[in-house]
Amino acid sequence: MNNKQQTFQFENAFADVFMFENGTEVREYHVMIHANSSRLPYAQQLEAVLGAYNQLIEGELVGAQAVFKRYFLSDAANQADDVIVSDVTDCAKSIIQQAPLDGTKIALWVYLMTNVQTGLSKSGLYEVRHGDFRHLWNGSAHNMAANSEYQTRLLFNEYNMQLIQEECTLEANCIRTWFFVNDVDLNYGGVVRARNQFFFTQGLTVNTHFIASTGIGGRQQDPNVLSQMDNYAIAGIRKEQVHYLYASTHLNRTSDYGVSFERGTQVNYADRRHVFISGTASINNKGEVVYPKDIIKQTHRMWENVEALLAEADCNFNDVAEMVVYLRDTADYELVREMYEERFAGKPYVIVHAPVCRPGWLIEMECMAIKAVDLPTMPKF
């Protein structure tokens, strides 16, 4: 087995860790750190989470460098500034109000690698260098344009200019995006319109390809921010390394119902495969909500859909390194937590409050998988 899962206990926090190791110099870790006492004030919960992170990178994960972090907060207006001041790690950081539903105020997902060089690139994207590749991460991009459509259009324009500075394009190099939409029921339509229009100008169509993505409810500390974008691109990636996942027995193309993202993307290297599964809900291959108003059946159908996408990349849930689970209704948390704990105990995951883009979907999940492969015609990671 190249994958290993462990849980570490700390003072007032715990961490679930997934490690990928295949004998090469780059090990990969996904870590989900949770505060374990909802009674503590926010400052102490933040201190506990950051303390757990620091102990990990000085101990079990020594030598690993953070390449991307996402903070899930219960009240960004009162909490985000403290994160910015307290965490000075040199990596892309995403900070979003999506309350952890275990009753705590903060959770942290961290993606780390060993033997890579990191730093801020000339474009403002965070660069992770190894071999022939530069992995370009960005978190918490936002602006103050008049509405969600204008904000998203400006986000794409700015990101496109950053990619051009890196001698990249959206079509050839961008692998994954996330959009966090303040009041998703009201503002998601504007995000969709802006993305559809911008993709068309960049040659991203139903006849070429789109980009794996999550579009979900979430808010920044400033209520005027209606659309926040996180993104990941790879400078140096070759077209033959990238494959898109469809699972057409279970899901339809998103363009069938007017949106433009891929269900999943796999990226092949000589020694490993990365699989990025987009936000996935209880949908069928006609684009319909399956099992309306039934959280248990929707959860099972969502898992089945994700399994079908993973299988297309010759992966399964054992290869999944992290999961983020989004719930529309906080009242569903205990039931969903029990289901996840029964099936995925020890796997790095977090369940947060974040309405899905269509009201009928009660739950959505996204994940990343890592699998050892032997593909000598592909470039080394």
Residues covered by each model-derived region:
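N-terminal presequence-like segments and the immediate start of the first folded domain
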Residues: 1-321, 327-381
